[in-house]
Design a protein with these regions (language model features):
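A short, flexible loop at the N-terminus of ABC-type nucleotide-binding domains that lies
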Residues: 1-7, 13-26, 76
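ABC ATPase "signature
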Residues: 220-221
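Short, charged/small-residue-rich alpha-helical element at the C-terminal edge
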Residues: 232-304
Length: 313
């Protein structure tokens, strides 16, 4: 298997006001060439810190990262020549219009003018930005500005794309357009490393995933493999006047608005479903989603953040 990104024992520690914060606590990852690899986890889990290290923006405290065979610390220039990055917080050149932003980015990467113009035109249409081509970036909404940054990177000829929360702030239609553009990059055999806390996005785009919590990889594999590794792979949603104590014999119980979620093995899930139906309670049973996997492993929803520290998102 050809490797695009190889990380071994990557740590990152911050010191502030006499206090030490561990952002990464020994990350091992291998991203195959041509794959889309998703890093999922809450804000503060360490996803952005890893992206910044792998894309040569930040030095690790220890460990190593190689991108396309080049060491990100010892040979950062070779890495930068072959990657493109959408940071979590983008700061585009506000005095340019949308067309200029994309076109000049491609020219600065060394792309010939004719090809840069062709790619700029194509990506503006693909991401529904053509009508805004002459709009100054400073006049765009936050979501439109984010979409322009995505256009820059996807129009490039970079072999590895680092996309840190690429669809943050976008409406559902715009998110789907970005997904389609990322899928095109995948078809072009480019490697994509993306972070997201939208689990539907992670599952739709990623051939492999790493679930990160507290600077560590908790689980790694395909979406199907990750779901299969939890002890209770089914979820039963029970509404009505039923107590947590009544449900505990069937599995792990989480309280939700209007009822309970029970994570259970298949036999217990079916038994609980039959019992709830017999008592007239609204009930549904389904295979566990990635959101359910996260909740079982971490004990908190993915949308519930850790206290934010510098660089630890």
């Amino acid at each position: 298997m050809e490797e695009a990104i190889r990380a071994r024992g990557v740590t990152r520690t911050y010191r502030s006001k006499g206090r030490e914060t561990v952002a990464l606590a020994g990350i091992d990852l291998t991203v195959p060439a041509g794959a889309t690899y998703g890093l999922i986890g809450r804000n503060g889990a360490g996803k952005t810190t890893f992206i910044r290290i792998a894309s040569t923006q930040l030095l690790p405290t220890s460990g190593s990262v190689a991108v396309l065979g080049h060491d990100a610390v010892a040979d950062p220039r070779s890495v930068r020549n072959r990657i493109a990055v959408i940071p979590q917080e983008s700061r585009p050149l506000y005095f340019l219009n949308v067309y200029e932003l994309v076109y000049l980015y491609l020219k600065l990467r060394g792309m010939p003018g004719t090809e840069a113009r062709r790619r700029t035109e194509a990506v503006l249409v693909e991401l529904s930005l053509d009508s805004r081509r002459k709009t100054l970036v400073s006049h765009l909404s936050g979501g439109m500005r984010r979409r322009a940054m995505v256009a820059m990177v996807l129009a490039s000829d970079a072999e590895v794309l680092f996309l840190d929360e690429p669809t943050t702030g976008l409406d559902p239609v715009a998110r789907r357009e970005v997904w389609s553009a990322i899928e095109r990059a995948i078809r072009d055999r480019r490697t994509v490393l993306l972070t997201t806390h939208y689990l539907d996005e992670a599952e739709a785009l990623s051939s492999r995933l790493a679930l990160i919590e507290g600077g560590r990889v908790l689980l790694e594999g395909t979406p199907a493999e990750i779901r299969s590794r939890i002890p209770r792979p089914f979820r039963v949603s029970v509404q009505g006047r039923v107590t947590r104590e009544e449900l505990l014999p069937y599995g792990e119980v989480a309280e939700v608005r209007g009822g309970h979620l029970v994570f259970a093995r298949e036999e217990e899930a079916r038994e609980l479903t039959r019992l709830a139906l017999a008592k007239g309670f609204p009930v549904s049973m389904a295979p566990a989603s990635l959101e359910d996997v996260f909740l079982q492993l971490v004990g908190r929803p993915i949308g519930e953040d850790d206290p934010e520290e510098e660089g630890t998102a």
